[in-house]
C-alpha cells in the first residue's frame, strides 16, 4: 500500500511535515546514539521515521492512530528489524516497546488539539510525576504553545504552563517551522522545541509541588490582577506580606512577572495548605 491516495484528516489534526531541513534538525536535536530507543508519536507517512532509521538509534517505536497510515507504515518499514509500530491513541495506548522496555527519547509531531494532555502523559505534572523519565523530547508544537513553555517572566506569553514546564524540564528552541513546511499547511506557525526532563532527584517533593500548583491556579485565574488581590483570598494577609517580602516577591506584581523559582520559594514558606 502507498500513501498516495490518503488525504489528511482534520479530525486527527494531520499536517505532514515535509521540509527536509526541519526534519534533519529534529533528528539532530535528539542526538541519537547506538543505545537510544526512540518513541515516535504520529509518524504519519514516515518522512521522519525514515530519518530516524538512518540514525544510529537501536530501536524506533512508533504509535499511529490512523489505521490507513498504519498499513502504509507496515508496508514501508515492516522489514526493518529496528522498527516497531503500535496502532492506537497515544493518550491511551501503552508507551512501552514491543519487548516490554521503554524508550529513552521521544520525537513527536503533536496534533495541536492534544498538546496539553500529551505533555502531561509524557512529562507528568508537578504533583504527578511520570516514570521512567525520558532523557529528552523533541516536539513540534504550535508556536503559541511553544513560546509559553519557554517564556521568561514579564513576557505576555509567560503563564502557569511556563512555570510548570520550567520546573519539570530544561526548555530550548530548536527551530521555527512556517506553514509552508507542511502538507497541508496549517493556519498557525509552529516551532520545534527540545525538552530535557529533570531526573527524580531534581523534581519537587509532592507536597511542595501541590502547594505550587494551588498557588498557580489561584493567581493565574486573574492574571491581570496584582498578587495582593489574587492571593489574599487563600493566604492570610498577615502571613502573605512578610512571606512574599522574604522571598523577593512584591505583592504589587502580577503573576506573569514572578519567576518559577520564586513560586517555589513562596510555596515552601507556607505551613498551610492553599
Swiss-Prot record:
Disulfide bonds: none annotated. CDD domains: AdoMet_MTases. S-adenosyl-L-methionine binds at residues 15, 17, 42, 64, 89, 109. This is Ribosomal RNA small subunit methyltransferase A. It catalyses: adenosine(1518)/adenosine(1519) in 16S rRNA + 4 S-adenosyl-L-methionine = N(6)-dimethyladenosine(1518)/N(6)-dimethyladenosine(1519) in 16S rRNA + 4 S-adenosyl-L-homocysteine + 4 H(+). Keywords: Cytoplasm, Methyltransferase, RNA-binding, rRNA processing, S-adenosyl-L-methionine, Transferase. Belongs to the class I-like SAM-binding methyltransferase superfamily. rRNA adenine N(6)-methyltransferase family. RsmA subfamily. Its EC number is 2.1.1.182. NCBIfam families: ksgA (TIGR00755). GO terms for molecular function: 16S rRNA (adenine(1518)-N(6)/adenine(1519)-N(6))-dimethyltransferase activity; RNA binding. The keyword Lipid biosynthesis does not apply. Specifically dimethylates two adjacent adenosines (A1518 and A1519) in the loop of a conserved hairpin near the 3'-end of 16S rRNA in the 30S particle. May play a critical role in biogenesis of 30S subunits. HAMAP family: 16SrRNA_methyltr_A. It is found in: Cytoplasm. Its main location: cytoplasm. The gene is rsmA. GO terms for cellular component: cytosol.
Amino acid at each position: 500500500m502507498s500513501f498516495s491516495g490518503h488525504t489528511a484528516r482534520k479530525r486527527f489534526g494531520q499536517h505532514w511535515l515535509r521540509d527536509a531541513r526541519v526534519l534533519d534538525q529534529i533528528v539532530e536535536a535528539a542526538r541519537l546514539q547506538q543505545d537510544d530507543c526512540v518513541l515516535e508519536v504520529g509518524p504519519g507517512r514516515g518522512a521522519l521515521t525514515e530519518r530516524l532509521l538512518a540514525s544510529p538509534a537501536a530501536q524506533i517505536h512508533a504509535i499511529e492512530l490512523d489505521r490507513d497510515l498504519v498499513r502504509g507504515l507496515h508496508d514501508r518499514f515492516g522489514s526493518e528489524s529496528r522498527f516497531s509500530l503500535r496502532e492506537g491513541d497515544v493518550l491511551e495506548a501503552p508507551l512501552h516497546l514491543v519487548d516490554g522496555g521503554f524508550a529513552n527519547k521521544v520525537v513527536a509531531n503533536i496534533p495541536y488539539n492534544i498538546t496539553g494532555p500529551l505533555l502531561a502523559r509524557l512529562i507528568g505534572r508537578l504533583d504527578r510525576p511520570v516514570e521512567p523519565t525520558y532523557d529528552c523530547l523533541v516536539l513540534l508544537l504550535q508556536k503559541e504553545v511553544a513560546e509559553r513553555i519557554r517564556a521568561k517572566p514579564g513576557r505576555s506569553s509567560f503563564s502557569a504552563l511556563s512555570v510548570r514546564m520550567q520546573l519539570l524540564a530544561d526548555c530550548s528552541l530548536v527551530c521555527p517551522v512556517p506553514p509552508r513546511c507542511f502538507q497541508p499547511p496549517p493556519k498557525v506557525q509552529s516551532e520545534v522545541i527540545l525538552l530535557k526532563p529533570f531526573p527524580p532527584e531534581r523534581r519537587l517533593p509532592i507536597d511542595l509541588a501541590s502547594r505550587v500548583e494551588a498557588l498557580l491556579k489561584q493567581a493565574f485565574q486573574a492574571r491581570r490582577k496584582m498578587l495582593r488581590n489574587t492571593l489574599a483570598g487563600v493566604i492570610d494577609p498577615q502571613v502573605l506580606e512578610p512571606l512574599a517580602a522574604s522571598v523577593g516577591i512584591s505583592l504589587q506584581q502580577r503573576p506573569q512577572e514572578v519567576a518559577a523559582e520564586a513560586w517555589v520559594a513562596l510555596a515552601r514558606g507556607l505551613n498551610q495548605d492553599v
